[in-house]
Amino acid sequence: MSAGNLLEALTDNLVDKTKCIFWGKCAETCILDNIRINRAPCSAACPLGLNIQGYVQLVARGKDDEARAVIAQDLPFAQLICRICDHPCEHACNRCKIDGQAVNINGIKRYLFAGEKMLPLECAEASGKTVAVIGAGPAGLLAAHDLRKAGHAVSVYEAEGKAGGLLRNILPVWKLPDAVLDEVVGIMEQAGVVFHYGQRIVDQKALDDLSQRYDAVVLALGAGGGRKASIEGEELPGVLSAFRFLMEVRAGGCQKLSGHVVVVGGGYVALD
């Protein structure tokens, strides 16, 4: 008997499949490797490895609070992510092979969290360490969240007047309202994260100064910038960068367009 067949046989003998609800928790502790290795395709496709089959099964059983708890174990800011997630899990969903349509996984996540108040951030005992995070965009916010959760004292330095980075400066308000970002920042401030706005770290001297004042410095600088197509004519008058155009729209200072407009591309930026 091959190793794979032996593991399958052990599973058949040790797991009561009539009682299994496939919620994925067993895979974290089970001694049988094939349960851990053969993860649900949706979970394997998720960048954070969320226990997707777990919270979907709990929702199906009317256990919404338990489903939220399962997601919250691995996903901070679920109220925010559920509005903008690219949901690669749905592309990997087994239902696509059966009837051509995935389970609406992100829709379920949004059902669970949209409109729900964010829970306070629970922090570990104070470590005595201090950390400066430069940048309050998506990377900086997540870094500050995880560091504060671990018990470190965190200060965030942001060049703009508010936190959020591209989430606030480019995404349309119908997709991600400012109030959601404000709630994220508010929860972090309640947990003790200190935000310093209008603080642009522009040279080595400023960085060295922070390094002297804090035990560690996290660089979460903006990576924003429009991509060029490298085709002839893209620098001509009337050809606009989607990145710059969306920023102007978000700021309320967009130039007025008239006549026919061609949008090159078919992704989320093009749709926005």
Residue ranges and their predicted role:
Residues M1-T130, V217-P237:
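Ferredoxin-type iron-sulfur electron-transfer modules and their immediate structural context
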Residues L219-A220, S241, V263:
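Redox-cofactor binding/interface segments in oxidoreductases and associated redox assembly factors
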Residues A144-D146, R168-N169, A229-G233:
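Short amphipathic alpha-helical segments
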Residues A153, G192-V194, G238:
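Conserved beta-strand segments of alpha/beta enzyme cores
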Residues R68-A78, D86-P88, L166-D215:
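N-terminal Rossmann-like dinucleotide/flavin-binding domain of flavoprotein oxidoreductases
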